[in-house]
A protein has these predicted regions:
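N-terminal cap/lid segment of alpha/beta-hydrolase-fold proteins
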Residues: 415-455
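Predominantly five- to eight-bladed beta-propeller fold
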Residues: 70-72, 158-214, 257-262, 312-314, ...
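Active-site-proximal cap/loop segments of hydrolase catalytic domains
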Residues: 477, 483-493, 498-691
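Short beta-strand element of the alpha/beta-hydrolase
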Residues: 456-466
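Bacterial N-terminal signal peptides
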Residues: 12-22
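Conserved beta-propeller blade repeats
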Residues: 40-55, 92-110, 130-131, 138-154, ...
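Structural motif
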Residues: 66-72, 117-120, 164-167, 208-210, ...
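Short loop/turn segments that connect beta-strands within beta-propeller blades
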Residues: 77-81, 125-129, 215-219, 267-271, ...
């Protein structure tokens, strides 16, 4: 399973690459290769200066020599364009969380420099220069927010072991290494209901973040929140600087507290008493935004906790004085992301996830009227200031880039991947609609090889998106589990790829998503197989050369499908599981399991039912490649290990690939490329190539 994840990772663009942005007008285009991953650059964390004159963002890439990823800070002028490429402001150690200072002259960011030290806060001139370290603290800074006057910064910190928060310049790296070594040598004491999280590991009391107030001029730091039972994050200053709103929850509480977020307010002063504003429920990352007049706060709100795994976040506003909440987008029946107030405070802009797209929209507070700000696009992040709106946008043929959104149209402000994409003959992507076995209308996309010939039947791969609360979109996403890149890789090597948004997916409303509640592996499989039948009926797919695969819930559904149908000649199950009993208490979804399936000792037959790929492994005939990271707490690799062992025992061709030190999303460059190579080799071994 996989929570919606929209933030992307990838390293600095060099001067040589900037110089190579001219289109390759005469050079023949070629197929995408696994090695191209080293040249892709991912753009993320978009920020806009208060005057709307500039944007800041991260550009992440992979370094072949060190086998690591690094994110660099970039800045671009609003008045520029793709022909006026932005400029890199940092190099060397990776950075995160860029933010403009209130006066717009500087950009702050987080970084662990030197490597291995605690993450601290840094500042650099907006136009470049040497960065300056703002904090030298005995703990990790994981987030922060400037006060409107620039005099203070609220820090989100964890791992603070003693009462003396402030450290000494030049000593942080050594102290950090000692503390980390000590932590690794001691037993971990756990008391949280959900006690583990992918990439974070085991959730101890020391890992719970709290808020601290930094005086920018003096460097003094004082605690704002300190309840050991709570975890505090996402601080946002009110426009007048008198209050800080933040998100808090109780990981040390019982089952009744699990998954509950609360929005609190506190004055930015040592000893101030926090006030709880409201409770909310959303399984995805919370996002707070103050109205310009400081009277209300926009945030994301879920529906019934019972449907935690299928929640489509609504946009809501809460009155600061009373806590009264108004849901602004409930009637849309679609998930929203990245809300931001317009400069005049009359409206909120956001992005809507809808049937293969994610487009920008606006809701007028006075009337509740919702209008589209653009169609047929995929927008992952949105920033607005001084009447300007910038977005991170992607399409089937374009990786995520920074764009100005003007009158419903995109104006490029970056083109980090243009040189590479100009070399590649990308596959075409077409929408298709078909009917599942019970008459339900299902939507998806067919990805055809660049040299596709109508009337020829092609080896066809059903590549399944993760989730289930997610969807295949018209995008070229460059992330560790990104189906859009994988389907391009397969298609440019001669395969037709089917992307089916099965029941359980988001993008078509709550009822469509909740159809599979407590009934995994049935309606989704019917939808997937019906998509294959449709492609065969259309004369596109070769019925004798079919394959299936996916990562996360895509891997789980692969296990379900090959245990239900023997037509597939090859399968790839990445970060999947065929025995859900194995995952109870070993992954991070205890809240979802108990809400949806109940504990196994209460509903053993239901748990056995949703684990049928393992208990009926003797039905499987498909050669299957299993893969996963050995540190994955999202879908632990035990799920793949058990299925591998079952097929190995049954004599079905199979292989297990374990990536050491990797979580649910692979990040080590050589491992990513290894995975892509294995994908292609497995398909070629059992399907062959184009017709």
């Amino acid at each position: 399973m996989l929570k919606i994840m929209r933030a992307k990772r990838l390293l600095p663009l060099t001067v040589a690459l900037i110089a190579s942005l001219a289109p390759l007008a005469t050079q023949a285009r070629r197929a995408l290769t696994p090695e191209d991953w080293y040249r892709f650059l991912a753009v993320s964390d978009l920020q806009m200066s208060a005057d709307g004159a500039a944007v800041a963002y991260l550009v992440t890439s992979y370094d072949k020599s060190t086998d690591e990823s690094r994110a660099a800070l970039w800045s671009a002028d609003w008045a520029g364009g793709a022909g006026h490429q932005g400029v890199p402001l940092t190099q060397g150690e990776s950075v995160s969380a860029p933010r403009f200072s209130p006066d717009g002259r500087s950009i702050s960011f987080l970084s662990a420099q030197p490597s291995g030290s605690d993450t601290q806060l840094w500042l650099i001139d907006r136009h470049g220069g040497e960065p300056r370290q703002l904090t030298h603290l005995n703990g990790e800074v994981s987030g922060y927010e400037w006060s409107p006057d620039g005099a203070h910064i609220v820090l989100v910190m964890h791992g603070v072991k003693d009462s003396q928060v402030e450290g000494k310049p030049g000593k942080v790296g050594k102290a950090s290494k000692v503390r980390k070594a000590e932590a690794a040598a001691k037993p971990l004491v756990l008391d949280a209901y959900q006690f583990k999280e992918d990439e974070e590991g085991y959730l101890t009391v020391a890992s719970r973040p709290h808020l601290y107030l930094l005086d920018v001029r003096s460097g003094a730091v004082e605690p704002l929140t300190a309840d050991p039972e709570r975890a505090d994050s996402h601080p946002q200053f009110s426009p007048d600087g008198r209050q800080v709103a933040y998100v808090s929850h109780k990981p040390g509480g019982g089952a009744e507290d699990a998954g509950i977020d609360e929005i609190w307010l506190v004055a930015p002063a040592a000893g101030a008493k926090p006030r709880r504003l409201l409770k909310t429920w959303t399984p995805n990352h919370q996002h707070l935004a103050w109205s310009p007049d400081g009277k209300s706060i926009a945030f994301l709100i879920g529906d019934e906790p019972k449907f935690n795994a299928y929640i489509l976040d609504d946009l809501a506003v809460a009155e600061v004085a009373t806590g009264h909440v108004r849901d602004l987008t409930g009637k849309l029946d679609r998930a929203v992301v990245s809300p931001a107030f317009t400069s005049d405070g009359r409206a909120i802009e956001f992005a809507i996830e809808d049937d293969g797209f994610q487009y920008p929209a606006q809701v007028v507070l006075a009337t509740g009227a919702i209008t589209h700000l653009g169609d047929s696009m995929v927008v992952s992040e949105l920033a607005t200031a001084a009447g300007h709106t910038a977005v991170l946008a992607t399409s089937d043929a374009s990786a995520i880039e920074v764009n100005a959104l003007e009158a419903g149209k995109l104006r490029p402000l970056s083109a980090h991947n243009r040189a590479l994409l100009d070399e590649i003959d990308l596959a075409t992507v077409e929408n298709f609609v078909f009917t599942s076995r019970d008459g339900t209308e299902i939507h998806g996309q067919i990805v055809k090889p660049p040299d596709f010939v109508q009337g020829h039947r092609y080896p066809t791969i059903l590549w399944i998106p993760g989730g289930p609360n997610g969807q295949d979109q018209h995008e070229l996403v460059l992330e560790g589990y990104g189906p859009p890149l994988e389907r391009q890789l397969f298609a440019t090597h001669g395969y037709v790829v089917l992307a089916v948004n099965y029941r359980g997916s988001s993008g078509r409303g709550a009822t469509f998503a909740r159809t599979i509640f407590a009934d995994w592996g049935h309606k989704e499989v019917e939808d997937l197989l019906a998509g294959v039948d449709y492609a065969i009926m259309r004369g596109i797919a070769d019925p004798g050369r079919l394959a299936i695969g996916g990562w996360s819930y895509g891997g789980i559904l692969t296990d379900y499908a090959i245990a239900s149908d023997t037509r597939f000649r090859a399968a790839i199950s990445g970060a999947g599981s065929g025995n859900q009993l194995t995952t109870y208490g070993t992954d991070e979804y205890i809240v979802e399991y108990n809400a949806e399936l109940g504990p196994p000792w209460r509903n053993p037959s239901l748990w056995t039912q949703v684990s049928y790929p393992f208990f009926h492994a003797d039905r499987i005939r498909t050669p299957t490649l299993f893969l996963g990271g050995d540190k994955d707490f999202n879908v632990p690799i035990a799920g793949g290990e058990q299925m591998y062992q079952a097929l190995r025992t049954l004599g079905i061709p199979t292989q297990l690939i374990v990536y050491p030190g990797e979580y649910h999303v692979l990040t080590r460059p050589s491992f990513l490329i290894d995975r892509f190579r294995r994908y292609l080799a497995w398909m070629e071994q059992y399907l062959g190539r184009s017709p």
